[in-house]
Amino acid sequence: MTTTPAPERAETEAMIAEVLSQYPKKAAKFRAKHLKANDPEGSKECEVKSNIKSRPGVMTIRGCAYAGSKGVVWGPVKDMVTISHGPVGCGQYSWATRRNYAHGHLGVDNFTAMQITTDFQEKDIVFGGDPKLEQGLDEIVELFPLAKGISVQSECPIGLIGDDIEAVARVSSRLDIPVMRVRCEGFRGVSQSLGHHIANDAVRDHVLGTGGDSFEQTDYDVALIGDYNIGGDAWASRRILEEMGLRVIAQWSGDGTINEMASTHLSKLNLIHCYRSMNYICTTMEERFGTPWTEFNFFGPTKIISSMRKIAEFFDDEIKAKNRAAIAGYQRCVDEITKAFRPRLEGKRVMLAVGPAPRHTIGSYEDLGMEVVGTAAEFAHRDDYTGPTACSKEGTGLYDDPSRVFELEEVAKRPDLIGSGPKEKYIFQKMGTPIEPYHGVDGFAIFARDMARHQQPGLDLLEAPWSKAGEVA
């Protein structure tokens, strides 16, 4: 595979101009605010507009507020049953593509992979769905006696017809189990980002600080915030922290429990992975309980080691000494990996297309000598772009809320490889572009191996059945 030269601002701006030229004048003016070439100096002309309504007709792939609450924040809590209050389709779509791993027995004390819904029908729209929800809550308690809580996630019809889920949840206090009601109807806000905020508010109002002093505390207790254990990444983070000598008392919310969430205020430090979805609760705990928090990044050795050092600064000399020993062990490992794979990947071009601004993963590619030439985000806010601006080089393309049908297809022609999330990946898979996500020190070895493997032109050697002569059987 031939590697194309490094990007420059003029090249990126020319590509953006070509994309915008395909739009009507008014739409082009609107989209021009969302497509920019990166300027490390942060000039006003290169500021990316974000977190505003998508243009009608632009085929956005944003999620909704319901997906942000149910699919991201509440769904991964393993000992809570999440019930989607509304039609069956929303719950299935929001959960079918996520791999939130969790310990436990499915359907006994782990409910993360279960799709439970009130299955709204037309008559429920006409007559109201409160009785159906109350019946559903009764059935959950009967079927899953080891469940520690229930979260009710509202879909669009609930808000449109004005069902009072708060009243139903209060009536269900007789069930002797906490019932969290979350007003996360999909039409609220401009993307799933508002769903994150609504879910954080529900945790703040109904869960945070309710856990008692049920365990012996130490000076080294930390909480993992905004790590949803997709593919087991929270477990990789936990291993690193434990090798530093720290004790993880709570995971929010991948492989986490409601009791952990209720007791997180006892943590000495909150470590936030996904800033966009959980910064709200971290600032709340800082204001209410005085708990400090910091972002961390365990993607790629450079960022891992930098984050380990930053975290260690919050603790005493014992933790700092253990941290230095852990880093020394990791360094030998990653040096061998980099030596083996960097020569094969040097200069390859990558585009990252995910939900929030992809500032976490840029370092992994750069550690292998690859160059990130574009970053696309669906629900980033203005402050999210300070990450890519700081990490990305001059001329890197920044694409906010890109159109699935046209914009992503055009900018995807530029790189050698695409890194993407579960919603974005399908279009790139159909285009024959390889994609993989990895996390942690152990994951870096697999990441490097597979990045090299994906550069083999295997797909170019295959012929699609419909391109052959004759009919497909």
Swiss-Prot record:
It catalyses: N2 + 8 reduced [2Fe-2S]-[ferredoxin] + 16 ATP + 16 H2O = H2 + 8 oxidized [2Fe-2S]-[ferredoxin] + 2 NH4(+) + 16 ADP + 16 phosphate + 6 H(+). It comes from Frankia alni. The keyword Transcription regulation does not apply. It is an enzyme of class 1 (oxidoreductase). InterPro entries: Nase/OxRdtase_comp1, Nase_comp1_asu, Nase_comp1_CS, Nase_Mo-Fe_asu. Belongs to the NifD/NifK/NifE/NifN family. This is Nitrogenase molybdenum-iron protein alpha chain. Binds 1 [8Fe-7S] cluster per heterodimer. Keywords: ATP-binding, Iron, Iron-sulfur, Metal-binding, Molybdenum, Nitrogen fixation, Nucleotide-binding, Oxidoreductase. Pfam families: Oxidored_nitro. One of its GO terms (cellular component) is molybdenum-iron nitrogenase complex. The keyword Transport does not apply. One of its GO terms (molecular function) is iron-sulfur cluster binding. GO terms for biological process: nitrogen fixation. [8Fe-7S] cluster binds at residues 64, 90, 156. [7Fe-Mo-9S-C-homocitryl] cluster binds at residue 274. Its EC number is 1.18.6.1. Its cofactor is [8Fe-7S] cluster; [7Fe-Mo-9S-C-homocitryl] cluster. This molybdenum-iron protein is part of the nitrogenase complex that catalyzes the key enzymatic reactions in nitrogen fixation. Tetramer of two alpha and two beta chains. Forms complex with the iron protein (nitrogenase component 2).
